[in-house]
């Protein structure tokens, strides 16, 4: 009887201890989960406090902002008044003349052909470049003022074209002068050359000459 009475007295005590143990175990599990995966408020705070790197394209000072706007103004004026130097070497020159005709009217884009390299800022190499003509091409290119651009028109100017394996043909005018725009075709149409001129205007728009000079 005494043993039964003792068991009856121990039963509520054991129940309380088991409940406390279960509560402690659940609390430990929650604390470990919180340690493994932080709460949703912590990333927001850390992201808010994190320092976001500033892109290099954005101006970081007033002086750089003024230089950037001046750069945009100069690029706008430069791309709106391209003066190409005619360097017709083969049948591609006929399509280049076609682009200057009233049907396509390249003057509406500010493109005006000049006869002197000292008044030009664009050279359109139209046709097959031979080994004898290569020194003349380089000499004319060196006489053009900076900044200067080169448009390679046609397969022969791009890589030799039909005469790629000829002993007397340069396999691409980019071996003589740096080329900015390649216009494919044999010969390319006037629309293709006009599209190449528009791509050159987009390239000039993205230039950052003054900003690069200012950041030195």
Swiss-Prot record:
* Family membership: Belongs to the complex I 20 kDa subunit family.
Q: Which UniProt keywords apply?
A: 4Fe-4S, Electron transport, Hydroxylation, Iron, Iron-sulfur, Membrane, Metal-binding, Mitochondrion, Mitochondrion inner membrane, NAD, Oxidoreductase, Respiratory chain, Transit peptide, Translocase, Transport, Ubiquinone
Output the Gene Ontology terms for molecular function.
4 iron, 4 sulfur cluster binding; metal ion binding; NADH dehydrogenase (ubiquinone) activity; quinone binding
What protein name is recorded for this chain? Answer: NADH dehydrogenase [ubiquinone] iron-sulfur protein 7, mitochondrial
Give the residue range annotated as the organelle targeting sequence: 1-37
Describe its PTM? Hydroxylated ar Arg-114 by NDUFAF5 early in the pathway of assembly of complex I, before the formation of the juncture between peripheral and membrane arms.
Provide the Gene Ontology terms for cellular component.
mitochondrial inner membrane; respiratory chain complex I
Q: In this UniProt entry, which cysteines form S-S bonds?
A: none
Q: Which organism is it from?
A: Bos taurus (Bovine)
Bilayer topology: Peripheral membrane protein
Which GO BP terms apply?
aerobic respiration; electron transport coupled proton transport; mitochondrial electron transport, NADH to ubiquinone; mitochondrial respiratory chain complex I assembly
Q: Which Pfam families match?
A: Oxidored_q6 (PF01058)
Annotated gene:
NDUFS7
Q: How does it assemble?
A: Core subunit of respiratory chain NADH dehydrogenase (Complex I) which is composed of 45 different subunits. This is a component of the iron-sulfur (IP) fragment of the enzyme.
């Amino acid at each position: 009887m005494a043993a039964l009475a003792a068991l009856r007295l121990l039963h509520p005590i054991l129940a309380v201890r088991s409940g406390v143990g279960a509560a402690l175990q659940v609390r430990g599990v929650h604390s470990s989960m919180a340690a493994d995966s932080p709460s949703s408020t912590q990333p927001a705070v850390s992201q808010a406090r994190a320092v976001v790197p500033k892109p290099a394209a954005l101006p970081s000072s007033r002086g750089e902002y003024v230089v950037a706007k001046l750069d945009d103004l100069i690029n706008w004026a430069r791309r709106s008044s391209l003066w190409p130097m005619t360097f017709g070497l083969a049948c591609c020159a006929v399509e280049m003349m076609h682009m200057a005709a009233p049907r396509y009217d390249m003057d509406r884009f500010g493109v005006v052909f000049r006869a002197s390299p000292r008044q030009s800022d664009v050279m359109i190499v139209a046709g097959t470049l031979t080994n004898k003509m290569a020194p003349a091409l380089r000499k004319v290119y060196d006489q053009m003022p900076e900044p200067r651009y080169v448009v390679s028109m046609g397969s022969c100017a791009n890589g030799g074209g039909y005469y790629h394996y000829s002993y007397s043909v340069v396999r691409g005018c980019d071996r003589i002068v740096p080329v900015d725009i390649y216009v494919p075709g044999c010969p390319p149409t006037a629309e293709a050359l006009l599209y190449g001129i528009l791509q050159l205007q987009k390239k000039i728009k993205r230039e950052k000459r003054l900003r690069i000079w200012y950041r030195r």
